[in-house]
Each structure stands twice: as C-alpha cells, then as structure tokens.
Amino acid sequence: MVVTGFKAFDSKTNNRYGMHFEEKKVYSVDGNIKFGTCGNGYHMCTNLEDTLRYVDNYDNIVIGEVIGFGDIDQYDDEYNGYYDMYAVRKLYIRRFISREEMIKMML
C-alpha cells in the first residue's frame, strides 16, 4: 500500500520530537506500526489542513508533500472530524511547499 499526503514540521523541518527531515529522502522506522501518541511510525495526513492538528505552536510551519509506504496503520477520528490519518513505516519527503501554496490548497 502507498499513501500520498502531507506532514507538518517546524521552521527547521524538524518534527515535534526533534528529528530533522530533508527533501528527496526516505526515512524508515523499526517496530510495529500503530497510529497514536503511544504508537509507532511516521504520522501523515491525506488532508493538508489535518496536519495542523499536530503542530505545537510553531512560528513558521513547514508542510511537506510526502509518500508513505511499507506497513501502514490508518486512523479516523470521527468524533473530531479528522479522517485519513496514517502511521507509516517508510516516509519519502517529496518536497516542502511554500506558505502561498499551502494557503491556495486549503481554500
């Protein structure tokens, strides 16, 4: 299975745990893949606006277009209206999008 979508980063393209990401690279994680705060895997969303749910007050948010593959765990939060969120074993950072592109995609 392959999933395309988005992932949020801080202004230095680090995730909330301090791991740095770069364009055109593949990242992989070991262990069982499970979505959630106690889970394991790289989190991503198919809807760009859903990535903002996971941002911790970054001054300058960077959004990456990503491809997730390998083992994948899908999660839908029907109570809060968030759908198609994933934890993936392997994550490819296709590119980082500009703030202008991000706004256009969300309108």
Regions flagged by a language model, labelled:
Residues M1-L107:
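Short, glycine-biased loop/turn motifs at secondary-structure junctions and
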